[in-house]
Regions:
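The cytosolic transmitter module of two-component sensor histidine kinases
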Residues: 15-22, 65, 91, 135, ...
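Juxtacatalytic helix/coil linker segments
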Residues: 33-113, 117
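Catalytic core of nucleotidyl cyclases, primarily class III adenylyl/guanylyl cyclases
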Residues: 74-77, 105-137, 149-186, 236-238
Length: 245
């Protein structure tokens, strides 16, 4: 049973002989194995399965590496007003449903939900696992996410997508750190999300993300105007999804 992956095994201890001591040792080993399994599962829930797997394989040293990634940022509109107008319990229910949909859609497109920030979520494609089609996956996820979130009553959102080089790795102090991505694509996606809240479709992407996407995915996007996003020197050329019939 253990060989088949069944860790819920306990042998009966018959006596205090050598065989009995071996039986006690086996049971203790299986208890520790079960505890490690639970810890791995909890670790994966907190940081994501890919990050947990990477940490177990390569360790948790601080530092990062340059990766080509696509970043998707999604944020609720008017969350402050929502929190003041609804009972706290209702707000928690709304947030949990919002994040559940976000995780489901991002997982479907093989992305990594890096963090929840209040009423927003940051998703990464291309780290910690390489993805040559990261922009394609992020753009497709953005389109699907917009429609999936439409089903949640009382929820309005903005979604931004960008792509480019960023530093991905364990950032923080030795005592406390997190796996995250830092760089221009993250900043641009965040600013695009702010602007998307003011646009009818609620979804915006940089044309750099669209440029690196597959031909099939590009057909779902329309190129638009150039804008000066807050905190950025160069202009960002916008793109948004083609309206579905």
């Amino acid at each position: 049973r253990v060989q088949r992956g069944d860790n819920d095994v306990e042998v009966e201890v018959f006596d205090g002989s050598e065989i009995g001591r071996l039986q006690v040792g086996f049971n203790r080993m299986m208890e520790e194995s079960a505890e490690r399994r639970v810890l791995r599962e909890l670790f994966g829930q907190h940081v994501g399965e890919d990050v947990a797997r990477r940490a177990l394989q390569f360790g948790t040293e601080l530092g990062g590496e340059t990766r080509f990634v696509a970043v998707l940022f999604v944020d609720m509109v008017g969350s402050t007003a929502t929190a003041s107008e609804r009972p706290p319990g209702d707000v928690v229910v709304l947030l949990n449903e919002f994040f559940r949909v976000v995780v489901d859609v991002i997982d479907k497109h093989h992305g990594f939900v890096n963090k929840f920030m209040g009423d927003a979520a940051l998703a990464i494609f291309g780290a910690p696992l390489d993805r040559p089609d990261a922009p394609t996956a992020a753009l497709a996820a953005a389109r699907d996410l917009r429609f999936a979130l439409n089903d949640i009553t009382g929820l309005d959102i903005g979604i931004g997508v960008s792509a480019g080089l960023a530093v991905a790795g364990n950032i923080g102090a030795k005592e406390r750190f997190e796996y995250t991505v830092i760089g221009d694509p993250v900043n641009e996606a965040s600013r695009l999300t702010e602007l998307a809240k003011l646009r009818p479709g609620r979804v915006l992407a940089s044309t750099s993300a669209v440029y690196f996407a597959s031909d099939e995915e590009q057909e779902h996007w329309e190129l638009g105007d150039q804008v000066q996003l807050r905190g950025r020197r160069r202009l960002t050329h916008l793109a948004w999804p083609v309206e579905r019939p």
